[in-house]
């Protein structure tokens, strides 16, 4: 390893320890020429992942984009950033373990939804509404029904009617909604 001070290429390792949760190794080194000490980090270099978008375009996987989407889904829910980072780490590790270096945005979206379902139903629905491009309150009701435990009976008709009645009050936004109110 080249000394950052004198550029001599020989150094000895004084100490090594795991860093960044085991994702890197921190090494304290000493230059054999000038005796100065410096620190280096050794990390795994991952082969880049390519994301295939809905329209067929390909772009490099962007961890920060995934992180922003998940943070937005949680909103002001108060979940710790460390938990969101851990979730992104899990999803990224899952993608890195795949043999194929290309992944569809749909596969990433489903992985996020699966993880959010376990963490926060509110964040799950918020993410699903953008990812699945909800167009009406009915889409929300349908998604909420998938979250219910199977032993529950049908949805509360009063709550569903209130949701749909609210949508019916604004038919210019959702012309199909007037048909939905009578289904409950």
UniProtKB/Swiss-Prot annotation:
Cofactor names: Zn(2+)
GO terms for MF: ATP binding; DNA binding; zinc ion binding
GO biological process: negative regulation of DNA-templated transcription
InterPro entries noted in UniProt: ATP-cone_dom, NrdR-like_N, RNR_NrdR-like
Annotated cofactor note: Binds 1 zinc ion.
Biological role stated in the UniProt entry: Negatively regulates transcription of bacterial ribonucleotide reductase nrd genes and operons by binding to NrdR-boxes.
Family as reported in the entry's similarity comment: Belongs to the NrdR family.
Protein name stated in the entry: Transcriptional repressor NrdR
Organism of this sequence: Cyanothece sp. (strain PCC 7425 / ATCC 29141)
């Amino acid at each position: 390893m080249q000394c950052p001070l004198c550029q001599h290429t020989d150094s000895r390792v004084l100490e090594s320890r795991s860093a960044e949760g085991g994702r890197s190794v921190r090494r304290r080194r000493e230059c054999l020429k000038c005796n100065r000490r410096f620190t280096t980090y050794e990390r795994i270099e991952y082969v880049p992942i390519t994301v295939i978008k809905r329209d067929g375009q390909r772009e490099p996987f962007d961890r920060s984009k995934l992180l922003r989407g998940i943070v937005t889904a949680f909103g002001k829910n108060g979940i710790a950033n460390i938990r969101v980072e851990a979730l992104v780490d899990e999803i990224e590790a899952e993608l890195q373990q795949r043999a194929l270096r290309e992944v569809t945005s749909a596969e990433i979206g489903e992985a996020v939804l699966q993880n959010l379902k376990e963490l926060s139903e509110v964040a799950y629905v918020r993410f699903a509404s953008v990812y699945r491009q909800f167009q009406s309150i009915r889409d929300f009701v349908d998604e909420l029904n998938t979250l219910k435990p199977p032993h529950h009976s049908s949805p509360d008709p009063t709550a569903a009617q209130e949701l749909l009645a609210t949508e019916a009050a604004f038919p210019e936004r959702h012309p199909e909604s007037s048909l939905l109110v009578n289904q409950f």
